[in-house]
Amino acid sequence: TTYNTLPYKFEAGTPAIAEAVGLGAAIDYLAGLERSAMEVAENALLQRANELVGSVPGMTVIGTAANKVPLMSFKIDGLHPSDIGTLLDQQGIAVRTGHLCAMPLMEFYELPGTARASFAFYNTLEEVEQLFTALQKIQRLFA
């Protein structure tokens, strides 16, 4: 066996060339966008989501700071967050579920976890409404 010199001996296998090229393309794309326009779009999505919370009986938003990134962590009474995620997935909607790398916070609120929708500038108001239509359907299914 022949060992290479530092730092090369710690780089086993083929470098992530395709990933590096993809990252470069993503950076170029984002650099061409106006950050303030992205922020306005994301805030509009979060605002619409906040308006629709009341349309889902038993839904509670976890984290309601006035100035926050466009994320919505939530729970629905009587439903486990993993079940919410699975049922949304079956309807073509992706959310994150579980402790979300915040176990001390979940323990503080005595929650088994939450579901979290993340909104980005490329999402649409229609997609936010689809999320809430799906949540209403899920809530009715288990009511």
What are the functions of these language-model segments?
Residues 1-143:
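Pyridoxal 5′-phosphate
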